[in-house]
Amino acid sequence: MPIFKYLWGMIKLLLPALILGLISCRTGRPLNYQVEPNGKVKAETTTMSFLEQLLREDSLLRPMLDKKDEYKIQVIYTRIDRNAANEPTFSDFFFNVNPAHYFYPASTVKMPAAIMALEKAASLKEQGINKETTMITGSATPGQTSVYNDPLTPDGRPNLASYIRKIFLVSDNDAFNRVYEFLGQSYLNGGLRAKGYPETEIIHRLQISLPEEENRRTNPIRFLDRQGKLLLDQPLAYNEAPYFQRRDSLGNGFMRGNTLVPQSMDFSHKNRIGLQSLHNILRAVIFPMAVKPEQRFQLSEADRLWLVKTMGEFPTESRFPPYPGQDTAGNKILFYGDGKSGPVTPGLRIFNKTGGAYGFLLDVAYFADLTNNTEFMLSAVIYCNSDGVLNDDKYDYHTIGYPFMRELGRKIYDYERSRKREHAPDLSEFRFNW
């Protein structure tokens, strides 16, 4: 019977959000909702007309917006205004956002995982552990692999800091997997749900295909000091909690090897997190005092600023790990598209995490123009799979996805540059020495 009690508890938690999503579908009006600690959903209806009208001014965006459901487009734009004391207030605008509509989050799940890893490391401070402590990943099952060194760190020692930098600089899948293994499913998902993101289900590694049972198991890990002394021996972990009973499917066919299976592909046991959750997780890092205490990540200010700096760094600016051959802005798709569209805009920093897989392209971003004192948040997802077939490596990223993202980011940026503010923001806290 415990499993039924658990499932009933999750149904009661998620049902209000699903009802609000259905209302949003029927009315065409977006809903800004927040799940409170007691499980109640507080909703505020906001107007979609402003954001949609603004985006429809753009001749490149308009035809895509006309097919918003075909492209599964969702957009969240947050206007930020400061008072005389430089304290921010936020106005959220939504286009076609519905928490009940599934999209594959791809590499955007790496952002909350990286943040939770920093939080977990901070909780181990009394044991002498921090983000730069040597982290040796072992293996205890046939599906697990070990890590004893990292040639991309200055001293060859693997550590969380290096993994997190790889995640934000080049979206390294193995780096995410090592963070996932450090956290374990229970800590990762339980921590995010406790902070107000109840639909979150990050339940598998990336790039490598493993059975569900193997993804429930996470590797044993040892932390060592500079002299090789053992600080912590974290054993293999196994998540026994049942997964959500989901019915998420996509496409009208998928490839299994060289064979086309003419039916939708089941995503019920793949990662899930909503766009608004990703948007609010980023806000909690950039503006921790703007969210409720229970929604904040328990990071030292030094770790938080280090994380923000890492999010805003271009791959070519990195010394460790070095990425000399990367496109300068290839990790900033909401303004630069595929990163091949020319030089970067001086003074503009974008603190973000991108993702792309199964035809979905995503970016979750905070923009700070340090030259023109302009800031805003923008998150978006688009589905680029015109033939509806998954796993065929024939996606429309370069013809639909990247152009849409680039144009969307520039449209909002141009609007923000021209928008009059009562108080210009002081963005000096984002002037890092990259």
Regions found by a protein language model. Give the residues of each.
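Bacterial Sec-dependent N-terminal signal peptides
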Residues: M1-N38
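Active-site SXXK
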Residues: F103-I129, M135, L378
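Extracytoplasmic
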Residues: E70-K72, F90-D92, N98-A100, Y104-V109, ...
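Beta-lactamase-like hydrolase cores
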Residues: P30-H101
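Active-site-adjacent helix/loop patches that line small-molecule binding or acyl-intermediate pockets
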Residues: G39-D58, E70, S139-A140, Q144, ...
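Structured C-terminal helix/loop/strand segments within mature extracytoplasmic catalytic/sensor domains
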Residues: R26-S59, T259-W434
